[in-house]
Curated annotation (Swiss-Prot):
It is found in: Cytoplasm. Disulfide bonds: none annotated. GO terms for molecular function: argininosuccinate lyase activity. It comes from Anaeromyxobacter sp. (strain Fw109-5). It comes from the Bacteria. Its EC number is 4.3.2.1. The lineage of its organism: Bacteria, Pseudomonadati, Myxococcota, Myxococcia, Myxococcales. Keywords: Amino-acid biosynthesis, Arginine biosynthesis, Cytoplasm, Lyase. GO terms for cellular component: cytosol. SUPFAM superfamilies: L-aspartase-like. This is Argininosuccinate lyase. One of its GO terms (biological process) is arginine biosynthetic process via ornithine.
C-alpha cells in the first residue's frame, strides 16, 4: 500500500524533525553548537544523489507513487544546480545539509517531499553521503598522485646518466643516479595509490536500509539502491553500518601518509635549492621573494608541502579521537568528522599538484651533483667490497677501509687520491687496481641487482613506469 505524505507547506516554519516529540524550540546556544552546514554543506551532491536513488527504489517497491518519485528526482536536480551556483542561502537554523535539501525540495514539490525519507534515517543517510564522498575522494587523490608520478618519471628519463651522492643521515653515502633517486619517490606514491584503492573498495558499499540502527519494516530493495549508486554491495549489519567510520579514518590515514611522502620531496626541494647544495633551481613561478631582502628566492612550495603534512596528521588524529570509545551505534560526536574528512583529500590534491608542477619546471644541476662525488668518500664501500671479492671477511675489509678513510682525512687528501702503496698499508690484499673503485660510473655499472641503481636496472624501471602510467591515461 502506498504511504500518504505528511502535510508540508513551504509557508509554514516547520519544527526540525528531530524535535517532533519535544516541547518548544531548542535553546539558541544548543542550536549554535549543533550547526554543521559550514562543514557538511560540501556533501550536497552526495546527499542529493543518495536521495534520488532512494526515492526511485521506493517507487519501484510500491512504497511511494512513481509520479511523485519522478517529481522529487527532477526537483533534486534543480536543488543540486542551485547549490552548485551558490543560490542556496545557508541558514544556521536548519543545522545541516540534509535539512537544507529537504526544505528546498518542499518549496519545489510541496507535500510530495514528505515521501522522501520513508525507510531512511539521518544515520544511514549521512553514512551513505560519507561513503560516496570517500569513493570520489579516493579517485581524486589517486589521479593527483598519478600526475605527480608522471612528472617524476619524465624528469627521471631526462637524467638517467646524472649521478649524485645518495645520503644517509644527510651525509654523503654512495653514488646513485638522479633517475634512481626520483623513481624512489615514484615507488612511495605507488604504495599510497594502492592504499587509496583499498580504501575505495571497502567504502563502496551502501548502508541505506540500516535506518537509525535496526533497519525498517518497509520492503526496501537495498541491493537495487546500491547498484543505482555504482556501489559494489550493501553493509551486512545495521548497527555497524551507522556507527562505522573506518573508511573515513582509512582515507585520512592514506592522505596523511601520502602527505608525509610529499613532505620528503618538499624537504629535498628546500635542501637542494640552497647555495650549500646547489643541486636544483626552482622556476620563478614556483618560488617567492622576500618583503625585505630583494635577493631572496624562497622554496615555499617545498616548505608548504612539509607543513601540510602536519595538518594531514592532525586530521587523522582528530578523527581517531572523535570515534574513540563511542558505544554502538550512532552518537552525535560523529558530526565532528566532517571537517577533517572533507578538507583532507582536497589538501592532498592541491599539494601533490603543486609539487608536481615544481618538479616539472625545475632545473637540475648535473655538474654540481657530480662535483659532490669528487672526494671519493661515497665510494668507500666499493673499496671494502673489493677486498671481499678477494676472500677477505667483510668486517675485516670494513675496518681496513675505515682506517684508510681516517688517514685520508688526517692527510687532507681525498680518498680517491691515495696511492696503491698507501692502500696496501691498511691491507695486503689491496692491489694497484683498487684505484678503479673510485670511478662512480663504473661503480653504478656493477650494481645491477633487481632494484639497484645500475644503468640497466634503472632503464628497466623507467620503462616499467612509463608503460604503467601511459596505460592509465588510455
Amino acid at each position: 500500500m502506498l504511504a500518504s505524505p505528511p502535510p508540508m507547506s513551504a509557508k509554514t516554519k516547520s519544527k526540525p524533525v528531530s524535535r517532533a516529540a519535544l516541547a518548544g524550540e531548542a535553546d539558541p546556544r544548543l542550536v549554535a553548537l549543533s550547526v554543521s552546514i559550514q562543514d557538511d554543506g560540501a556533501l550536497y551532491a552526495e546527499d542529493i544523489r543518495g536521495s534520488q536513488a532512494h526515492v526511485t527504489m521506493l517507487a519501484e517497491q510500491g512504497i511511494v507513487p512513481k509520479a511523485s518519485a519522478r517529481r522529487i528526482v527532477a526537483a533534486l536536480d534543480q536543488v543540486r544546480a542551485e547549490f552548485a551556483a551558490g543560490k542556496i542561502r545557508l541558514d544556521p537554523a536548519l543545522e545541516d545539509v540534509h535539512t537544507h535539501v529537504e526544505r528546498r525540495l518542499g518549496e519545489l514539490v510541496g507535500a510530495d517531499a514528505g515521501y522522501l525519507h520513508a525507510g531512511r534515517s539521518r544515520n544511514d543517510q549521512v553514512a551513505l553521503d560519507e561513503r560516496l564522498f570517500i569513493v570520489a575522494a579516493c579517485e581524486r587523490c589517486d589521479a593527483a598522485l598519478g600526475r605527480l608520478q608522471r612528472a617524476l618519471v619524465a624528469r627521471a628519463r631526462e637524467h638517467e646518466k646524472t649521478i649524485l651522492p645518495g645520503y644517509t643521515h644527510l651525509q654523503r653515502a654512495q653514488p646513485v643516479s638522479l633517475a634512481h633517486h626520483l623513481l624512489a619517490h615514484v615507488e612511495a606514491f605507488a604504495r599510497d595509490r594502492d592504499r587509496l584503492a583499498d580504501v575505495r573498495r571497502r567504502a563502496a558499499v551502501s548502508p541505506l536500509g540500516s535506518g537509525a540502527l535496526a533497519g525498517t519494516t518497509l520492503p526496501l530493495d537495498r541491493e537495487a539502491t546500491a547498484k543505482a549508486l555504482g556501489l559494489a554491495g550493501v553493509t551486512q549489519n545495521s548497527l555497524d553500518a551507522v556507527s562505522d567510520r573506518d573508511s573515513a579514518i582509512e582515507l585520512l590515514f592514506a592522505c596523511a601518509l601520502a602527505a608525509v611522502h610529499l613532505s620528503r620531496v618538499g624537504e629535498e626541494i628546500v635542501l637542494w635549492t640552497t647555495k650549500e647544495f646547489g643541486f636544483m633551481t626552482l622556476a620563478d613561478a614556483f618560488a617567492t621573494g622576500s618583503s625585505l631582502m630583494p635577493q631572496k628566492k624562497n622554496p615555499d612550495v617545498g616548505e608548504l608541502a612539509r607543513g601540510r603534512a602536519g595538518r594531514a596528521i592532525g586530521d587523522l588524529v582528530a578523527l581517531l579521537a572523535i570515534v574513540k570509545s563511542l558505544p554502538l551505534s550512532y552518537n552525535r560526536d560523529m558530526q565532528e568528522d566532517k571537517r577533517p574528512l572533507i578538507g583532507g583529500p582536497d589538501a592532498l590534491v592541491l599539494t601533490a599538484d603543486a609539487v608536481g608542477g615544481a618538479i616539472e619546471t625545475a632545473t637540475f644541476h648535473a655538474d654540481r651533483m657530480e662535483e659532490a662525488l669528487g672526494s671519493g668518500e661515497a665510494l668507500a664501500t666499493d673499496a671494502a667490497e673489493y677486498l671481499v671479492e678477494r676472500g677477505v671477511p667483510f668486517r675485516e675489509a670494513h675496518e681496513a677501509v675505515g682506517k684508510a678513510a681516517a688517514f685520508s682525512s688526517a692527510e687532507g687528501r681525498p680518498l680517491a687520491k691515495l696511492t696503491a702503496d698507501e692502500w696496501r698499508r691498511f691491507h695486503p690484499a689491496f692491489q694497484k687496481d683498487v684505484l678503479r673503485c673510485f670511478d662512480a660510473r663504473k661503480s653504478l655499472a656493477r650494481r645491477e641487482l633487481t632494484g639497484a641503481p645500475g644503468p640497466r636496472q634503472v632503464a628497466r624501471q623507467l620503462a616499467r613506469w612509463e608503460k604503467a602510467l601511459a596505460k592509465e591515461r588510455r
